[in-house]
């Protein structure tokens, strides 16, 4: 589970890292949602926008997971028939573009990458760097 902020020095600072438990069914999104709302209702210090951001990320995670689960085959199709391969630098994290290299190394080192990194990749592949 992720929050919007990124701290390159501490990859877990703004991340609850509960996706493995959610993925394996040890906890459910409903359980997490209930716990977050319950904690917020009992707290005098939790900020509404932080709780909202956390819940929004939980909903986005479930939406993305649903897409992958139900339309994965369509998502994996080569709709435009592209034949070009991406270069090795995208697998090694040596693109020379610091945010991209950090995203790639983070994915390899910690097994996770935030949605912010996802949007960086979308932008870069859209402009065809």
UniProtKB/Swiss-Prot annotation:
Keywords: Membrane, Transmembrane, Transmembrane helix. Its main location: membrane. One of its GO terms (cellular component) is membrane. InterPro entries: Crypto/Photolyase_FAD-like_sf, UV-DNA_repair_photolyase. The chain crosses the membrane at residues 103-125. It is a single-pass membrane protein. It is found in: Membrane. This is Uncharacterized protein R853. It comes from Acanthamoeba polyphaga mimivirus. The lineage of its organism: Viruses, Varidnaviria, Bamfordvirae, Nucleocytoviricota, Megaviricetes.
